[in-house]
Amino acid sequence: MEKLNIIFAGTPDFAAKHLSALINSEHNVIAVYTQPDRPAGRGKRLTASAVKELAMEQQIPVYQPANFKEVDSTKQLAALNADLMIVVAYGLLLPQLVLGIPRLGCLNVHGSLLPRWRGAAPIQRAIWAGDTETGVTIMQMDEGLDTGDMLAKVSCPIERDETSASLYEKLALQAPDVLVDTINKLVKGELKAEKQDPQLACYAKKLSKSEALIDWSKDAVFIERCIRAFNPWPVSYFVLDDKVIKVRQAGLLATKSEQTAGTIITASKNGIQVATGEGIINLEVLQLAGKKALPVQDILNSRRELFAQGTLLQQG
């Protein structure tokens, strides 16, 4: 089988797992593209991405252009003379000129079963919408937003208690092997590309912090899905006594309430029950400002007065 010279473009840990699989494959990773180092942590020190750290460990050349608008960035990539470029959660837009540089084009690993959930936040939006299944699609990139021909798919169930964090981990275990298998089939001429049906497309817009503010007038089922979808970021929250309180985990109760949405019905070691537009949600793990996340029972031991019965929480 022909060994390909591959450029890899990616940034977070999810992408690094794919880079690791490529490094351990029969192919050659000749260069890595990743986003510029960013300030992180309380000290705001410049921090390398997970992909850059792995590439440096493996002594693979790393390139970190701010964008591909400059001619020099494009020339630099072309000079690598790669057979194929793999893009996984890179975070930068690639112009059509770049997509056409590698001999076999560019492949993208996308965290949904396309054409459902094209866009920036497919994993989070799938949970947010109440989908029972998602997966990963390997596609040939074109100039559109996740509109390229599909080369491989693998599905993954979304469990009842799934968070974005846990779903990322599941997909990160599945997808790298599928990527390597797809590349091998591409080399052997065994792939059959499938066009996307635009009629089935929907879009996963980027998450915003403003979305994470809980709107208690929504039904409990929807709010609970949002809490799982926004974990680990941006984390659902509400405001009480001008304090931001993040909700890390919640459950649903079968009972109904006639109370105004956002009213605390009761607070006990089993959770803080809050009335919603329809149904009751039980807040189980909270994070007070500047503190670590704790079970409600532990928080009530020291801050019970915050969660008195009848307290009305601020609406989103």
Curated annotation (Swiss-Prot):
Enzyme Commission designation: 2.1.2.9
Q: Which GO terms describe its molecular function?
A: methionyl-tRNA formyltransferase activity
Q: Which reaction does it catalyse?
A: L-methionyl-tRNA(fMet) + (6R)-10-formyltetrahydrofolate = N-formyl-L-methionyl-tRNA(fMet) + (6S)-5,6,7,8-tetrahydrofolate + H(+)
Record PROSITE patterns: GART
- What's a GO cellular component annotated to this UniProt protein? cytosol
- List UniProt keywords, sorted A-Z: Protein biosynthesis, Transferase
Q: What is the uppermost EC class here? A: transferase
UniProt feature coiled coil, ranges: none
Family, as annotated: Belongs to the Fmt family.
Q: What is this protein called?
A: Methionyl-tRNA formyltransferase
Organism of provenance: Psychromonas ingrahamii (strain DSM 17664 / CCUG 51855 / 37)
The organism's lineage? Answer: Bacteria, Pseudomonadati, Pseudomonadota, Gammaproteobacteria, Alteromonadales
